[in-house]
Amino acid sequence: MAKKSMIERESKRAALVAKYATRRQALKAAIQKTKSFDERLVLQHQLQDLPVNSVPCRLHNRCTITGRPKGYYRDFGLSRHELRAMAHGCLLPGVTKASW
């Protein structure tokens, strides 16, 4: 089980990414469109003034049950441990053990 502080930190980052997504996208589009160097510098400064944690690449996928950051299956939103436990308990519809 991951520390609660790490899970909470990740959820705050996700909220910041969602909050600033449209503004960040608009600034990036404006930077691409502008031709003057001075205006581009001003727009880049505005982009840099946004919070650091509002960048989508700082998000990390975590298991919804345990908060484990590694061994994450994005189709289910679970770590490999919880995926295996839930599959054995028949809690995931359509998931069966492989047999050949």
Swiss-Prot record:
Function text: Binds 16S rRNA, required for the assembly of 30S particles.
UniProt xrefs under InterPro entries: Ribosomal_uS14, Ribosomal_uS14_bac/plastid, Ribosomal_uS14_CS
Keywords for this protein: Chloroplast, Plastid, Ribonucleoprotein, Ribosomal protein, RNA-binding, rRNA-binding
Protein localization: Plastid, Chloroplast
Organism: Nephroselmis olivacea (Green alga)
GO biological process terms held by the UniProt record: translation
Entry's family note: Belongs to the universal ribosomal protein uS14 family.
Subunit details: Part of the 30S ribosomal subunit.
Keyword field contains Chloroplast: yes
UniProt-listed NCBIfam families: PRK08881.1 (NF006477)
Classification of source organism: Eukaryota, Viridiplantae, Chlorophyta, Nephroselmidophyceae, Nephroselmidales
Name this polypeptide is given: Small ribosomal subunit protein uS14c
